[in-house]
Amino acid sequence: MILKTFQNHSILGAIFFGIFVAPSFSDEKETKSKANSDVKKAFIDGTGQGWRELTGEDFVNVNCDPKTWTWDGGHASCTGNPVGVIRMKKPTKNFELVCEWMHKKHAGNSGIFAWASPASIEKLTAGKGRLPDGIEVQVLDLGYETNWEKNKGEPSDWFTSHGDVFPTGPAKMKPFPPVAPNGKRSFPTKRLTRGINEWNHYYIRAINGEVRLWVNGEEVSGGTNCEPAEGYLCLESEGSPIEFKNIRLRILP
């Protein structure tokens, strides 16, 4: 009789636990699952249909020295001097780009221009200025941010080392949040950049005036309503050595 009573109470307790307690575990699991699903992950290596590797044959020197950029197949090495860019031979509009990059010096600075305006490229070719107008995807070493904080005694509120996207010169863009105080830069939602002498992976998607950036497999920043929304894809030399490899492009309609 005692055993039966105990069994009945155990059964009732199990039912109560299942009805009232189990959902809390279920809700917690669903909440975590939803949070994870909100992060847009896409570690794309550029080997599917329509992708092709970019080499030195695809680029034209705009205003760098002849020895600033050297190529070994699809592996590019840049000295960083002088400040300037190389551009693809033809302008692009809608595309996807993947690449890996690695800074070779503490606080290194570089960038990828998704759409550099042809007019600004012409000026650079004529010796007027160093960098083009357009939409830039920042390629910055962690040390750049560290040096700023050390010298200024406070964190930077106008840039990060984790994949800012922003317009340069007269170019325009509506940045995705979080947005820099000046209202122009899209700051990354996560800090995923790896440090000096480590490879980082970028996936850039530029379609119909919208640019999105994935850093090491996760989407972090971007913007829409870009002007220009067509132009030259450029790699930037900006004062320090950097390497790019596995640069692959897919042109979209």
Place the predicted regions along the sequence by residue.
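Bacterial N-terminal signal peptides that target proteins for export
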Residues: I2-L12
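Bacterial N-terminal signal peptides
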Residues: L12-F20
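Sec/Tat signal peptide C-region and signal peptidase I cleavage site
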Residues: P23-F25
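Carbohydrate-interacting regions of secretory-pathway proteins
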Residues: D27-P253
